[in-house]
Amino acid sequence: MRYTSLFTAVTAALASTAAAVGVSGAAEGFAKGVTGGGNASPVYPKTNDELVSYLGDSQARVIVLTKTFDFRGTEGTTSGTGCAPWGTNAKCQLAINQNSWCDNYQPNAPKVSVSYDNAGVLGITVNSNKSLIGQGSAGVIKGKGLRIVSGAKNVIIQNIAITDINPKYVWGGDAITINNADLVWIDHVTTARIGRQHIVLGTQADNRITISNCYIDGVTDYSATCNGYHYWGIYLDGSNDMVTMKGNYIYHTSGRSPKVQGNTLLHAVNNYWYDNAGHAFEIGSGAYVVAEGNVFQNVKAVAESPISGKLFSSPDASTNKVCSSYLGHTCQINGFGSSGAFSQADTDILSKFKGKNIASAAAYNTVVSSVTANAGNGKL
């Protein structure tokens, strides 16, 4: 009788643990309603090949990472001639001559020898209806990013780190690429030591995207600004995109943090930018940006000049009241410390937000403690 009771208790405990494995919380903002792999039984890849297979097949899946998956060296290396557009100082990034980029766009740059890891150049394909989640702080992908493209939809990436993708080389690879997709939630993801973009949304329609609680770590040995600050942070360039950025920690970058253009509606709320040696926002034609409740600390230029797109920077309490008719709340002012100016009130863009799923906004004075405690993997 005791053995039966013990067996029953153990079985129940295991079942409870299994049932608890899954996505934590729910997406706010434009990707609200995303379910990823839903209630699919979790799978635990043990090898790189298993991980690639689970992410790329046609089944709804909850994929749990319990270890580091290191792709470096798995697809060989390529050596050749690249270029040094930013100089030959040991701290400068070099460029791979991808699609003759050096020849066509940097013909006067010094030619240099390059040797890069092939695995990093193109990320792992992620198909529709997937949840990729890390267990604790153990879920890490090294040397290769993720690609959510070609019509993929309903995808959740949560609580993992993506690191060490050819950091010396521009065109060496991106951490997360989204292009021609819909309903994608990137949450509690750490990216570090990346050759090109930490997160990039391509020129096709990427539709409804939420990027939340992520840690964009720009500390690097090589950068396009030759100073240890990564330049290629976040690039939002889709033709019909709605992007929520909330609760992210964007640290030690020098540009494109984010660059916004194409036809992109961006709600940037309660993010923390710290220690930027160049510029954070780059707002190009076709960008419609509402920024509220953020903190900019030691950011040389909060927005690169000129601003070609549209911006509502939530400049003051009186002006911010207009938000309530469109976003459902009064916009929160941003906080600044040793940072450049950021004040523009293109109120005509607010109507574009009306009727959409809009993330809530807290006062900026809560942001630093909240973001530093919660952003990145291992902090669920």
Curated annotation (Swiss-Prot):
The active site is at R256. Disulfide bonds join C83-C102, C92-C226, C323-C331. One of its GO terms (molecular function) is pectate lyase activity. Pfam families: Pectate_lyase_4 (PF00544). Glycans are attached at N129. One of its GO terms (cellular component) is extracellular region. Keywords: Carbohydrate metabolism, Cell wall biogenesis/degradation, Disulfide bond, Glycoprotein, Lyase, Polysaccharide degradation, Secreted, Signal. The keyword Acetylation does not apply. It is found in: Secreted. It comes from Aspergillus fumigatus (strain ATCC MYA-4609 / CBS 101355 / FGSC A1100 / Af293). GO terms for biological process: cell wall organization; pectin catabolic process. This is Probable pectin lyase A. Pectinolytic enzymes consist of four classes of enzymes: pectin lyase, polygalacturonase, pectin methylesterase and rhamnogalacturonase. Among pectinolytic enzymes, pectin lyase is the most important in depolymerization of pectin, since it cleaves internal glycosidic bonds of highly methylated pectins. It is an enzyme of class 4 (lyase). It catalyses: Eliminative cleavage of (1->4)-alpha-D-galacturonan methyl ester to give oligosaccharides with 4-deoxy-6-O-methyl-alpha-D-galact-4-enuronosyl groups at their non-reducing ends. Residues 1-20 form the signal peptide.
